[in-house]
């Protein structure tokens, strides 16, 4: 499989960023060469100890539960350490063919409609979200041995919302959004050249929100809360959205 095949062509149309699964030739090659690889062996056995999560203390709605945990990550109650940057989250997307990719983004808001983050609409993640409007977000709050998985359908946020959030960004980040053709292959000086160009263009003026920049919202149909415990006997509770709009809560085996 060529590198082009692996990473897709950013200049390509939005519908098929990453074509096709790995070819058999590539898999055979990997199997042949695997014995030559030096194994990085990790034998640590960290023990996680979070406050126990029980059905009795779970909120009836996952949004409420998320709010409680997020507030505890920011301002922890006695005995729990604070979480550095709890809004940092791993967002997983996939192509129409089902090839996944993941990367970190910053959660910028959450309400009954879903979980919002902002990005470039021509980036790899956005091209994948256009081709396959489903995503998963994973929060890992190491300090508190907590994990949350959100799975749902996605939609772009209203233009007005993107513009009003963009207006709150520092000027440098606003100009960066104009300069960066996110996920595109570029030359060594392209970014600086483009930044210089947009600095000139917006000199003495407010920086508008570019058309190619804005938010995505994940409207969840599944949210799981994971709380780490000793001997890998963690607590897991999954909320699943039912046809009648109610959330069904199940405990899952760790
Ligand atoms: C902690 C952290 C937060 C980030 N936040 C964002 C973000 O909010 N939006 C964004 O577009 N990229 C963000 N990035 C960069 C992305 O991880 C990624 O490199 C970029 O969006 C391009 O991804 P893509 O090529 O898969 O589209 C962040 C990276 C880190 C490590």
Where are the regions that the model predicts?
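Binding-site signature for planar aromatic cofactors or substrates
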Residues: 1-254
């Amino acid at each position: 499989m060529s590198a082009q095949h692996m990473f897709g062509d950013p200049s390509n149309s939005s519908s098929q960023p990453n074509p096709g699964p790995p070819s058999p030739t590539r898999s055979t090659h990997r199997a042949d060469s695997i014995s030559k690889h030096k194994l990085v062996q990790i034998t640590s056995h960290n023990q996680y100890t979070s406050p126990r999560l029980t059905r009795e203390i779970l909120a009836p709605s996952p949004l409420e539960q998320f709010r409680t945990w997020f507030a505890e990550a920011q301002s922890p109650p006695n005995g729990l350490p604070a979480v550095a940057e709890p809004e940092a989250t791993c967002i997983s997307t996939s192509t129409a063919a089902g090839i996944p990719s993941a990367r970190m983004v910053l959660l910028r808001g959450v309400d009954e409609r879903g979980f919002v983050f902002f990005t470039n609409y021509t980036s790899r993640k956005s091209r994948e979200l256009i081709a396959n409007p489903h995503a998963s977000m994973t929060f890992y709050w190491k300090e508190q041995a907590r994990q949350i998985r959100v799975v749902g359908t996605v939609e772009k946020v209203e233009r007005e919302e993107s513009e009003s959030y963009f207006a709150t960004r520092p000027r440098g980040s606003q100009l960066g959004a104009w300069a960066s053709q996110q996920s595109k292959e570029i030359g060594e000086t392209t970014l600086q050249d483009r930044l210089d160009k947009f600095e000139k263009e917006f000199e003495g003026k407010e920086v508008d929100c570019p058309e190619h920049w804005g938010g995505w919202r994940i409207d969840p149909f599944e949210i799981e809360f994971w709380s780490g415990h000793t001997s890998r006997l963690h607590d897991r509770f999954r909320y699943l959205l039912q046809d009648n709009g109610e959330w069904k809560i199940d405990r899952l085996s760790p």
